[in-house]
């Protein structure tokens, strides 16, 4: 089982973040994820707010094996520029970009002059964008007159050698799951790791795949799982932090939080993570260390480390 790690919520300086990613690579992690578009910043903490795309490419350039990814939000990007940026990253670090995208839902975007349309419009926008991006990556001249994406003979050079870059889409609602069925190589399951909730969303994705004649088994399943390696095995000590860092899951009861978090000794956390990956049929679990300081992040990285590659 390949394993990824996420360092989110702008908890680290560039120097610390690069050290953590170097450590993750040395310990055999398959991928590291960092913060995405800068307007995802919330609150008033004084901290480095590093541009997600710049950091992604900088980390790709300084590492050798590990994949690097960060969240792209559809209304932050022009389709052709995003296709070109991703193709450039692929040229710099072949096969190592984790291209993760979703519709976004951050009120802070308006501070940056970004006026997000409704959720339904953002779904349409993402559909148009990924259709255009796929064509550009194939080396085609793309003309499109969509509601949100308008291109007139756009091309990028160089296109990715394989004519494609794998796409991960994060989502849980039916309309986004239809986009997963249409465009995604990986479904980033944007849910707490609770079997009933994941099963319900999985059934909707399977239905959307059948409607398109696609085998849902073709789509890799990934999930970020809140992980805290610590001396206490009592998950209750992490509930407040879990809810603060995952406000979209704020309605979870304490019992559900206990089931949705991986907390305790390294051995306990490894066992729990393996159990969740098996139960939820995950191909690519990601331990979510968002919000942890550098020392606690290193402890978790070492405690959860997969076997080093030969």
Per-region residue spans from a language model:
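Active-site-adjacent structural elements that line small-molecule/cofactor binding pockets in enzymes
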Residues: 1-310
